Amino acid sequence: AGLQAANIIAADPEIRRKIDRQLVDNELHALNAFAVEALIAAYNEGGEWLDELKKYLWENYEYLRDFFTRHLPALPVTPLEATYLVWVDCRTLKRPTTEIARQLLEEGHVWINEGEMYAGEGFLRINIACPRKTLAEGLERIRKVVG
């Protein structure tokens, strides 16, 4: 994030044009001074780091999934799909997830995205790209609020 560099892959030329326009409009189209060298180093020498990161994220996912299975079984966790963002099905709570997310923030001090932001009504989205200790603490807070 500090390097202000990212890859966006869009096969459709029209979608690419729309993305390019948004990048320019939001002043996100220029790389900073270190970005090019950092990207070259990451692609050429980052394989081992990436493998370890993916392993750690998978272990975080397993930790979260097992936690929900044991402590919050009414809230199924969706299978992970090439990301560090986990979707939790909250439809059994029969409450809007905007309300659940607000309660988690106010009572548990856990900031979670509600699915409505992403056309996922009834789901919460949890970011697992964090130290396991942080994840464990956040999950325990979630359990105390909604469990």
Please annotate each region the language model reported.
Residues A1-G147:
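PLP-dependent class I/II
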